[in-house]
Amino acid sequence: MAEGEDMQTFTSIMDALVRISTSMKNMEKELLCPVCQEMYKQPLVLPCTHNVCQACAREVLGQQGYIGHGGDPSSEPTSPASTPSTRSPRLSRRTLPKPDRLDRLLKSGFGTYPGRKRGALHPQTILFPCPACQGDVELGERGLSGLFRNLTLERVVERYRQSVSVGGAILCQLCKPPPLEATKGCSECRATFCNECFKLFHPWGTQKAQHEPTLPTLSFRPKGLMCPDHKEEVTHYCKTCQRLVCQLCRVRRTHSGHKITPVLSAYQALKDKLTKSLAYILGNQDTVQTQICELEETIRHTEVSGQQAKEEVSQLVRGLGAVLEEKRSSLLQAIEECQQERLSRLSAQIHEHQSLLDGSGLVGYAQEVLKETDQPCFVQAAKQLHNRIARATEALQTFRPAASSSFRHCQLDVGREMKLLTELNFLRVPEAPVIDTQRTFAYDQIFLCWRLPPHSPPAWHYTVEFRRTDVPAQPGPTRWQRREEVRGTSALLENPDTGSVYVLRVRGCNKAGYGEYSEDVHLHTPPAPVLHFFLDGRWGASRERLAISKDQRAVRSIPGLPLLLAAERLLTGCHLSVDVVLGDVAVTQGRSYWACAVDPASYLVKVGVGLESKLQESFQGAPDVISPRYDPDSGHDSGAEDAAVEALPPFAFLTIGMGKILLGSGASSNAGLTGRDGPAASCTVPLPPRLGICLDYERGRVSFLDAVSFRGLLECPLDCSGPVCPAFCFIGGGAVQLQEPVGTKPERKVTIGGFAKLD
């Protein structure tokens, strides 16, 4: 029974030792110098927070041409950047240099370099090529002497060496052979001792008796970090410079205005952060292992995908080669046919010329015919022969080869193809689309339009994302509503919430993947549901002076000849007429919104609403007036009625003339341009591209807005005791265009439903 327990205890101890050994071996890569790939020896902390051995740093600076900036390796150190090398106690003690001589040595070694004069106005900045971050790090003028030693890293390296070394006990350096195992160390004496030797070399009552014993070690370090500038113990930490400083550094102008905290506070804060971070990592080991498995799977997928990409490229290039080979064969066949045709013609021409030689062919036959003495027979035979001889004579006099020997017409121009082949490269993802803000707007629905930048790779389809910005943010990442595989360069968002702000963005996709998102565009939706109506010119509209479009969404006032003829009857004044157009839909409840565009060249146009009964009563057969101050809105904007009347006005209009909006001096209740004591001072604002009218039937209020930015222009009270309809008044020439609902546009769009997939 006891043997079983002992075996179990031994097994657990061995398992613990194996785990410790494995952990230390896995940690070894953190203790290797990036230059020499060996354990750190007197590591220095670079400004980039990476570490490097002092000897390696000195060697690297020497290779870079910075001579004299690495310190004197034979001198005894007096700064954190240099420390005494391990010295055997049996060797004779080296004479320490005097402090003043050492100071001069350090200044000469660390403060000058070839090519610089002492006291130069612009000292050289030493750059150290950090092997870890692959960048140049500024060391300042002092070089390595301005760096701190990483004593903590030294201690970790020492503990690691002791843990992995088998039978590597540290021996007493003062014992006679054979030495005993050391039990103490002395940083002042820089030696290790057994118990007897420590008592012998630290006798009671002497100054050495005050030396504090440490654990035995082969590498002795300073007790603490010293300021490289003032040789004082560092006591504070500068958060701005992220550097340890002493009391003297703290009051220097270099750290003026910096956030400086005691080392104890910085120590506690960093220790707490490191402890929490380490605890989080240790508490999520399963997550780490899962991510490692995911990365390994990604590596395998990368290998497979890379091989597939290679095969695909090879197949495509082979396809190009096959097309080129087929084209080469067809071109060579065309050249061959042309060559044979030319050779045939030239051979026939040679045969004809050979027949002209003496005694052969045509010439020989002609010579024999000339021997004929019978005249009728000669005439019969010589007639046809003479024609052939005449043609041969003409060909002989105007000799020219029957075919050209040049094949210049068969030259290939492959410049464009060579350029295409040279520029042949992997397909890139589409660039970020550019949203067309001139065509993108929100009305009854949201219409989004975009385009790709010039020279952008094509996009097969797009992804449109949108969300409301005026809702409380939910914890976690921002959630977007998404519509994928959108064809074309426009999209339609149906049923948006009224009085909201939407942010939208687009990105393209092709075979190479998804591109970058476009810049976000913010759109304000109308404050109320959009009212759909058409223009009705049956009430108060003169067909001679008003022209309504076929779709009944636009109207133009044309004064024309009838107005001029009517004006001839008047001896004085300016003859004007008021024409009105109403909407064919009346509002009896709720809130409604619509928008229109007024021609900036209009003389005087009034846009607004009114009680349907009052509008028909006032404008049916409306008389011509002789004053431009005549106003049909029962007091609004004109001062025609007593302002003291408490009853709500039946009309509310916004006056537009010559590209300006005429407003009164009141605040939000700019219902008219006159006050109780007389005409009020009026002001004008520029006419926006579109005007919006929002009617709140229950509250009896109507608001006029800039339909682009939804900035309020005017708010008026209104009598809503009956049906209220839109109204447009014209004095002189002018034009109004109702904003067409997005859903009726003939342009091809992609509809995005109100319930889209969440990201």
From Swiss-Prot:
<comment type="function">
    <text>Microtubule-associated protein that is involved in the formation of parallel microtubule bundles linked by cross-bridges in the proximal axon. Required for the uniform orientation and maintenance of the parallel microtubule fascicles, which are important for efficient cargo delivery and trafficking in axons. Thereby also required for proper axon specification, the establishment of neuronal polarity and proper neuronal migration.</text>
</comment>
<feature type="region of interest" description="Required for microtubule association, proximal axon localization and axon formation">
    <location>
        <begin position="411"/>
        <end position="429"/>
    </location>
</feature>
<keyword id="KW-0206">Cytoskeleton</keyword>
<dbReference type="InterPro" id="IPR013083">
    <property type="entry name" value="Znf_RING/FYVE/PHD"/>
</dbReference>
<feature type="domain" description="COS">
    <location>
        <begin position="370"/>
        <end position="427"/>
    </location>
</feature>
<dbReference type="GO" id="GO:0007409">
    <property type="term" value="P:axonogenesis"/>
</dbReference>
<dbReference type="GO" id="GO:0032880">
    <property type="term" value="P:regulation of protein localization"/>
</dbReference>
<feature type="domain" description="B30.2/SPRY">
    <location>
        <begin position="513"/>
        <end position="747"/>
    </location>
</feature>
<protein>
    <recommendedName>
        <fullName>Tripartite motif-containing protein 46</fullName>
    </recommendedName>
</protein>
<feature type="domain" description="Fibronectin type-III">
    <location>
        <begin position="429"/>
        <end position="528"/>
    </location>
</feature>
<dbReference type="InterPro" id="IPR050617">
    <property type="entry name" value="E3_ligase_FN3/SPRY"/>
</dbReference>
<feature type="zinc finger region" description="RING-type 1; degenerate">
    <location>
        <begin position="33"/>
        <end position="59"/>
    </location>
</feature>
<dbReference type="GO" id="GO:0044304">
    <property type="term" value="C:main axon"/>
</dbReference>
<dbReference type="GO" id="GO:0001578">
    <property type="term" value="P:microtubule bundle formation"/>
</dbReference>
<dbReference type="GO" id="GO:0030517">
    <property type="term" value="P:negative regulation of axon extension"/>
</dbReference>
<feature type="modified residue" description="Phosphoserine">
    <location>
        <position position="627"/>
    </location>
</feature>
<dbReference type="InterPro" id="IPR027370">
    <property type="entry name" value="Znf-RING_euk"/>
</dbReference>
<dbReference type="Pfam" id="PF00643">
    <property type="entry name" value="zf-B_box"/>
</dbReference>
<keyword id="KW-0863">Zinc-finger</keyword>
<dbReference type="GO" id="GO:1904115">
    <property type="term" value="C:axon cytoplasm"/>
</dbReference>
<keyword id="KW-0175">Coiled coil</keyword>
<feature type="zinc finger region" description="RING-type 2; degenerate">
    <location>
        <begin position="172"/>
        <end position="231"/>
    </location>
</feature>
<dbReference type="InterPro" id="IPR017907">
    <property type="entry name" value="Znf_RING_CS"/>
</dbReference>
<dbReference type="InterPro" id="IPR036116">
    <property type="entry name" value="FN3_sf"/>
</dbReference>
<feature type="zinc finger region" description="B box-type">
    <location>
        <begin position="222"/>
        <end position="263"/>
    </location>
</feature>
<keyword id="KW-0966">Cell projection</keyword>
<dbReference type="GO" id="GO:0048490">
    <property type="term" value="P:anterograde synaptic vesicle transport"/>
</dbReference>
<dbReference type="InterPro" id="IPR043136">
    <property type="entry name" value="B30.2/SPRY_sf"/>
</dbReference>
<dbReference type="Pfam" id="PF18568">
    <property type="entry name" value="COS"/>
</dbReference>
<keyword id="KW-0862">Zinc</keyword>
<dbReference type="InterPro" id="IPR000315">
    <property type="entry name" value="Znf_B-box"/>
</dbReference>
<comment type="subunit">
    <text>Interacts with TUBB3 and TUBA4A.</text>
</comment>
<keyword id="KW-0963">Cytoplasm</keyword>
<dbReference type="InterPro" id="IPR003961">
    <property type="entry name" value="FN3_dom"/>
</dbReference>
<dbReference type="InterPro" id="IPR001841">
    <property type="entry name" value="Znf_RING"/>
</dbReference>
<dbReference type="InterPro" id="IPR017903">
    <property type="entry name" value="COS_domain"/>
</dbReference>
<dbReference type="GO" id="GO:0001764">
    <property type="term" value="P:neuron migration"/>
</dbReference>
<dbReference type="InterPro" id="IPR001870">
    <property type="entry name" value="B30.2/SPRY"/>
</dbReference>
<feature type="region of interest" description="Required for proximal axon localization, axon formation and migration">
    <location>
        <begin position="1"/>
        <end position="166"/>
    </location>
</feature>
<dbReference type="InterPro" id="IPR040859">
    <property type="entry name" value="Midline-1_COS"/>
</dbReference>
<feature type="modified residue" description="Phosphoserine">
    <location>
        <position position="330"/>
    </location>
</feature>
<feature type="binding site">
    <location>
        <position position="227"/>
    </location>
    <ligand>
        <name>Zn(2+)</name>
    </ligand>
</feature>
